[in-house]
């Protein structure tokens, strides 16, 4: 039975807090422990939740056997492991205390509150994905998620941050709750707990907008160029693209350790990312799950990081649902509440890219590996793909190692004193001629394969003669992918690097609009090039530059690299050579 201390003092000093007889300070009230010897912080407004004092973590450990009997070995938020004086403990967010299993740590980590199944989950929030403790009220938070007001049948304030007791109204101007009995300070909501029936939340969207990671994790690039998940927030991604370290540490790849001033821990291996559940903007473009499609000032789609967001008229920013865009202050407003508005990010293609095989790594004339892979022979004699560029193919014909490593026995890779696990090769895909089809701008218009739909001055669509191009804001010009439009200088600019991949040639057909010779033709918006066999092939650029290897070509204004796999910029490209077709072609 919990004995409440100084209830009258609690009511009078709800905001100021309460000092317990033993000298400790509690934000709401003090409760005498069951033994009657010690005090703990409690909150009578949340009914009478059992609260006990937490214990300090003591001693480092790797496994439970390193701790005394009755202790557990816990991973802390700092990435270290320490012994907890509970047989089944839970690490607190302060990294210094722990609580028994079945208890939740307080914000300062000094007390533990028991939230058993009989208490937690009594209040189900709409959708049955989140729940609040008994005698609490579900309220929407500012980010659209569910929060809990620590009072039964509470009034949720329209700022989505605060709440008031039942029967009271929110006075956000004076930050008070108004009731017939007087005024009270506004109460602040806390996040709702995900129910046991709810699926794990994946709120961390990676920069490629195609991969997502679980809550409290960090996106890190893998050797394949894709993204994986480091299982802790704000982690440090190591340069080997295989490991990661806790925040405020340094990757020591030679010793395979994470180093900080206070401690050393082992490197962590990244986990694969998860595909994003996409929100379709149109037939070709999509945004990550939980985002909203909004038009950018270029006419292209952008993604706002809110569900059911409000797209601002400047075509750059967006606001949470229910808010209004205030362009003068650069804020989102809801009543007296103001929050900074968010900037949209470019949406990504959601349908298979017609150029998907263009960047493949060719193994021979019939087989290829994805971009940033290496062709390696399998034990069958066929080609396999190692999921990293310029990799070392191991003699067992099963594994491969990163560049600079040596293949060791049992599938390991070694570089100096460092050992990592080898990667298994994947099957190649057979190279086939792409089906030629137009790129749809909308339901009524399209552009040829290898070009990009851009909005025109007339409000309709026009075609840029480059794939995945950047549409300039003047709606008359476009630039290659990776460049920005400089409207005043009338140039396409790139801060660093002036390289783009070259394009593979396709076989010339017997019919077409551009005559090559010897009865061979290429389609409109293509160029004729001699292939490696001396015949004719088609380059998907207008006035394209044919590479010496007879397999690739580059846009006008570029020249081919020595191997023909890259296009090097001669000088800053002027956009007067990148004019688009006056009108797109209708879909058939």
UniProtKB/Swiss-Prot annotation:
Glycan attachment sites: 38, 372, 525
Main location: secreted
GO cellular component: cerebellar climbing fiber to Purkinje cell synapse; endoplasmic reticulum; extracellular region; extracellular space; glutamatergic synapse; Golgi apparatus; late endosome; lysosomal membrane
Post-translational modification: Cleaved by ELANE; proteolysis is blocked by SLPI and is concentration- and time-dependent and induces CXCL8/IL-8 production; granulin-3 and granulin-4 are resistant to ELANE. Cleaved by CTSL in lysosome thus regulating the maturation and turnover of progranulin within the lysosome.
Role according to the record: Secreted protein that acts as a key regulator of lysosomal function and as a growth factor involved in inflammation, wound healing and cell proliferation. Regulates protein trafficking to lysosomes, and also the activity of lysosomal enzymes. Also facilitates the acidification of lysosomes, causing degradation of mature CTSD by CTSB. In addition, functions as a wound-related growth factor that acts directly on dermal fibroblasts and endothelial cells to promote division, migration and the formation of capillary-like tubule structures.
UniProtKB keywords: Cytokine, Disulfide bond, Glycoprotein, Lysosome, Repeat, Secreted, Signal
Subcellular location: Secreted; Lysosome
Full protein name: Progranulin
Intrachain disulfide bonds: 125-138, 132-148, 281-293, 287-303, 294-311, 304-318, 312-325, 319-332, 363-375, 369-385, 394-407, 401-413
Residues making up the signal peptide according to the UniProt record: 1-17
Family label: Belongs to the granulin family.
Any one biological process term the GO annotation gives: synaptic vesicle endocytosis
Statement: the UniProt record of this protein carries the keyword Membrane: no
Tissue and organ expression note: Ubiquitous; most abundant in the spleen and several tissues of endocrine significance.
Complex and partners: Progranulin is secreted as a homodimer. Interacts with SLPI; interaction protects progranulin from proteolysis. Interacts (via region corresponding to granulin-7 peptide) with CTSD; stabilizes CTSD and increases its proteolytic activity. Interacts (via region corresponding to granulin-7 peptide) with SORT1; this interaction mediates endocytosis and lysosome delivery of progranulin; interaction occurs at the neuronal cell surface in a stressed nervous system. Interacts with PSAP; facilitates lysosomal delivery of progranulin from the extracellular space and the biosynthetic pathway.
Source species taxonomy: Eukaryota, Metazoa, Chordata, Craniata, Vertebrata
Molecular function as annotated in GO: cytokine activity; protein-folding chaperone binding
């Amino acid at each position: 039975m919990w004995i409440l201390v100084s209830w009258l003092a609690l009511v009078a000093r709800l905001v100021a807090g309460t000092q317990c007889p033993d000298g400790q300070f509690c934000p709401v009230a003090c409760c005498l422990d069951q033994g009657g010897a010690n005090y703990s912080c409690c909150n009578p407004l949340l009914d009478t939740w059992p609260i006990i004092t937490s214990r300090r973590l003591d001693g480092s450990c790797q496994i439970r056997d390193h701790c005394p009997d009755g202790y557990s070995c816990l991973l802390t938020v700092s990435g270290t492991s320490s012994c907890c004086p509970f047989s089944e403990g839970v690490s607190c967010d302060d990294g210094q205390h722990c609580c028994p299993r079945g208890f939740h740590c307080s914000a300062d980590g000094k007390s533990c509150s028991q939230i058993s199944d009989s208490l937690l989950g009594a209040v189900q929030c709409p959708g049955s994905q989140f729940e609040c403790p008994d005698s609490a009220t579900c309220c929407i938070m500012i980010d659209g998620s569910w929060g809990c007001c620590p009072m039964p049948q509470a009034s949720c304030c329209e700022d989505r941050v605060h709440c008031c007791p039942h029967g009271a109204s929110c006075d956000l101007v004076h930050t008070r709750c108004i009731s017939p009995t007087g005024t009270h300070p506004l109460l602040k909501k806390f996040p709702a707990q995900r129910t046991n029936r709810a699926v794990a939340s994946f709120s961390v969207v990676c920069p490629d907008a195609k991969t997502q990671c679980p809550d409290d994790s960090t996106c890190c690039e893998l050797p394949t160029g894709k993204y994986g998940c480091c299982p802790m927030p704000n982690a440090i991604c190591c340069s080997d693209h295989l490991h990661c370290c806790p925040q405020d540490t340094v990757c020591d790849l030679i010793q395979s350790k994470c180093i900080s001033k206070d401690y050393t821990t082992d490197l962590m291996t990244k986990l694969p990312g998860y595909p994003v559940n996409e929100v379709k903007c149109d037939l070709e473009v999509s945004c990550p799950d939980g985002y909203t499609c909004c038009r950018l000032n270029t006419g292209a789609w952008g993604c706002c990081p809110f569900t059911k967001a409000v797209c601002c008229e400047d075509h750059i920013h967006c606001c949470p649902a229910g808010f209004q865009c205030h362009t003068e202050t650069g804020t989102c407003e809801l009543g007296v509440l103001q929050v900074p508005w968010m900037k949209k990010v470019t949406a990504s293609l959601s349908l298979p890219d017609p150029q998907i095989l263009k960047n493949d790594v060719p193994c021979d004339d019939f087989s290829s590996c994805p971009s940033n892979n290496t062709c390696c022979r399998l034990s069958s004699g066929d080609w396999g793909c190692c999921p990293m560029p310029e990799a070392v193919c191991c003699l067992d014909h099963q594994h491969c190692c990163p560049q600079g490593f040596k293949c060791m026995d049992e599938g390991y890779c070694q570089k100096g004193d460092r050992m990592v696990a080898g990667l298994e090769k994947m099957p190649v895909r057979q190279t086939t001629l792409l089906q030629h089809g137009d790129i749809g701008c909308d339901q009524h218009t399209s552009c040829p394969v290898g070009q990009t739909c851009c909005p025109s001055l007339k409000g309709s669509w026009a075609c840029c003669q480059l794939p995945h191009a950047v549409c300039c804001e003047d709606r008359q010009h476009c630039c290659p992918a990776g460049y920005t439009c400089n409207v005043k200088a009338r140039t396409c600019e790139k801060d660093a690097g002036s390289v783009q991949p070259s394009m593979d040639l396709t076989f010339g057909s017997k019919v077409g609009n551009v005559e090559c010779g010897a009865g061979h033709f290429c389609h409109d918006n293509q160029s004729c090039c001699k292939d490696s066999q001396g015949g004719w092939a088609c380059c998907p650029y207008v006035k394209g530059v044919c590479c010496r290897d007879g397999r690739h070509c580059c846009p006008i204004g570029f020249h081919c690299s020595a191997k023909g796999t890259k296009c090097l910029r001669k000088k800053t490209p002027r956009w007067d050579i990148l004019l688009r077709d006056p009108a797109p072609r209708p879909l058939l």
